[in-house]
């Protein structure tokens, strides 16, 4: 069964120097699509797209070689999403099944066999979702998707939690941060959480269970950490960068560890305007271990992903792991949804609902 459908698509147009401007750096285009599956491939209907701050980093352009490819001009913007298979020429993916992975943010998409077979280090780029607990599909782009895998693999693979240790999680109400806070409490750690508003502070302390927290817009980061962790920090789960990273270094215990997940405060700044950390010599003085990562890295993915798949859906269904979502409706809201992550307009995981399951 063939035919062609109109297909509104979110397209990357040019690299911004600051916040991307809708209609200049991104655009919506109708890119009609054939409903015939390619050999060994799929046709999908996108259900919910996840949006993440690191996408701004990918807007540097395709000519920049980095941990993930930059977006190509005049090509669809991609990110971790969940979709329904509507045409299949691949026995592993029957029509009507759900798939998740790195998908184009468009109403419909073609998934070639090459993408199905591809891997990013230890992880496939596309995989089948079973949804055994009949959860809202948005969880599979958040707590059970990229955010959850990022938090789980790095927490158990790099943080290596020790009961009684003190961990500071910044951007603690973000999609990754909120999971790390809860995993740390499950493992008996003392959690200090920092956020950008009083509403988020209430959430991370009174709903997620952080021991203490602070609003960095009201209290300088370094001052707050000295107040809340006078004996220093064992672990920092770093999502923000900039002054937060500097404060992390100056408040670490000897042999402490900083796990660097991202630098969200710096993504929209030109290189010459990015924060200059001035206390790097404290790294050797305090014997600090700093480790960056991507969730699919061989050293953390292979040993942890099966436990994630077996445990997290159950915990989400039981309410043991909580999460918040800021959901936007319709592909036309993609720019607004994306910008909300940098302007304080989102809470938890930002998702874009495009179609019903």
Curated annotation (Swiss-Prot):
Use case: Fusaric acid is phytotoxic to plants such as cotton and banana. It has been shown to induce programmed cell death in plants. In addition to a mild toxicity to animals, fusaric acid exhibits acanthamoebicidal, antioomycete, and antimycobacterial activities.
Instruction: Work out whether the entry's keyword set contains Phosphoprotein.
Output: no
The record's keywords, sorted A to Z, are:
Oxidoreductase
Per the record, the coiled-coil ranges are none
The catalytic activity of this protein is classed by the Enzyme Commission as 1.-.-.-
One Pfam family this sequence matches:
ADH_zinc_N
Q: In the record, which residues are listed under signal peptide? A: none
Q: Does the keyword Oxidoreductase apply?
A: yes
Name the Gene Ontology molecular function terms of this record: oxidoreductase activity, acting on the CH-CH group of donors, NAD or NADP as acceptor
Task: Describe which pathway this protein belongs to, using the record's wording.
Answer: Mycotoxin biosynthesis
Q: What happens when the gene is disrupted?
A: Impairs the production of fusaric acid.
Instruction: For the region Disordered, give the residue spans.
Output: 1-22
Q: What top-level class of enzyme does the UniProt entry assign?
A: oxidoreductase
Indicate, by first and last residue, each region the UniProt record lists as having compositional bias (Polar residues): 1-17
The role this protein plays is: Dehydrogenase; part of the gene cluster that mediates the biosynthesis of fusaric acid, a mycotoxin with low to moderate toxicity to animals and humans, but with high phytotoxic properties. L-aspartate is suggested as fusaric acid amino acid precursor that is activated and further processed to O-acetyl-L-homoserine by cluster enzymes aspartate kinase FUB3 and homoserine O-acetyltransferase FUB5, as well as enzymes of the primary metabolism.
Tell me which family the UniProt entry assigns to this protein.
Belongs to the zinc-containing alcohol dehydrogenase family. Quinone oxidoreductase subfamily.
This chain's protein is named Dehydrogenase FUB6
Give the source species.
Fusarium oxysporum f. sp. lycopersici (strain 4287 / CBS 123668 / FGSC 9935 / NRRL 34936)
């Amino acid at each position: 069964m063939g035919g062609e459908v109109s297909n509104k698509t979110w397209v990357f147009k040019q690299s911004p120097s600051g916040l991307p401007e809708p209609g200049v750096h991104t655009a919506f285009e109708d890119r009609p699509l054939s409903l015939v599956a390619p050999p060994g491939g799929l046709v999908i209907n996108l259900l919910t797209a996840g949006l993440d701050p690191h996408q701004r980093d990918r807007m540097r352009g395709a000519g920049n070689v980095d941990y993930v490819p930059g977006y190509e001009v005049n090509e669809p913007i991609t990110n971790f999403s969940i979709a329904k298979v509507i045409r299949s020429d691949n026995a592993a993916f029957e029509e009507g099944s759900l798939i998740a992975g790195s998908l184009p943010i468009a109403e419909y998409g073609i998934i070639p066999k090459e993408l199905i077979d591809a891997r990013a280090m230890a992880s496939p780029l596309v995989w089948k979702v079973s949804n055994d607990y009949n959860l809202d599909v948005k969880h599979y782009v958040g707590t059970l998707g990229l955010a959850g895998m990022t938090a789980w693999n790095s927490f158990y693979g790099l943080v290596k939690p020790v009961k009684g240790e003190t961990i500071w999680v910044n951007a603690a109400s973000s999609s990754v941060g909120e999971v790390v806070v809860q995993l740390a409490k499950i493992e008996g750690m003392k959690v200090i959480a920092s956020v950008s508003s009083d509403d988020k502070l209430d959430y991370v302390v009174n709903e997620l269970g952080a021991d203490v927290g602070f609003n960095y817009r009201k209290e300088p980061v370094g001052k707050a950490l000295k107040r809340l962790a006078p004996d220093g920090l064992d672990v920092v789960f770093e999502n923000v960068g900039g002054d937060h990273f500097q404060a992390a270094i100056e408040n670490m215990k000897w042999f402490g560890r900083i796990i660097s997940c991202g630098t969200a405060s710096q993504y929209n700044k030109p290189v010459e305007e990015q924060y200059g950390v001035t206390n790097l010599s404290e790294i050797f003085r305090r014997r600090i271990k700093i480790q960056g990562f991507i969730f699919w890295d061989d050293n953390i993915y292979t040993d942890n992903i099966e436990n994630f798949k077996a445990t997290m859906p159950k915990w989400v269904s039981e309410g043991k792991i909580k999460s918040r979502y800021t959901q936007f409706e319709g592909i036309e809201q993609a720019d607004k949804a994306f910008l909300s992550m940098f302007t304080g307009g989102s809470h938890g995981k930002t998702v874009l609902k495009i179609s019903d399951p």
